[in-house]
A protein has these predicted regions:
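Conserved catalytic motifs of the protein kinase core domain
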Residues: 2, 19, 118
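Charged helix-capping and loop-helix junction motifs
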Residues: 8-11, 106
Length: 154
């Protein structure tokens, strides 16, 4: 669900049992591909729309960005860390100036988190990114292929 739809109808959708997700869709919308920025924008825009500083629920937005997104993509086995579930996770460095002081970890992540805080990502138990480096991935080849596709569809 895009941030505008989530902002406009979030409560109604939740009451109807519709799972909400947070995502990015590339250069056509904002070019950042930054989930932290998306969560922040949803919360801030919700507050502005409702003219109420308490309108946004950081817990609900974080849940939509994690478990909600997994469910919406048809991956209920990736919605939490538990035996028998996929080991998909992100390790965040909390010992950075933008994450201090820690009063409420969820609010810190949603309002202050940044992609530069990511130290590790794991997908299905395999570490794909660690300390600023993609492992076992030729990023230059990926960039080249992406540009080829863009050039072809332009």
């Amino acid at each position: 669900v895009g941030s505008e739809m989530c902002i406009r109808d979030r409560e109604k959708m939740l009451q109807m049992g519709i799972p909400l997700a947070v995502g990015t869709d590339g250069p056509s919308s904002n070019n950042a591909l930054d989930m932290f920025r998306e969560m922040y924008l949803i919360c801030v825009l919700q507050k502005l729309r409702e003219k109420n500083a308490a309108a946004a629920d950081a817990n609900a937005i974080l849940k939509a960005a994690t478990a909600g997104s997994a469910r919406c993509m048809g991956l209920p086995e990736a919605d939490c860390i538990a035996p028998g579930k996929l080991a998909d996770l992100t390790v965040i460095d909390l010992h950075r100036p933008n994450m201090q002081p820690i009063n409420n970890i969820t609010k810190n992540l949603v309002y202050s988190g940044a992609k530069t805080n990511v130290r590790l990502t794991m997908v299905d138990g395999r570490i794909l990114y660690e300390n600023g480096r993609f492992l076992n991935t030729d990023t230059d080849e990926i960039y080249k292929n992406a540009q080829t596709v863009i050039d072809r569809i332009r």
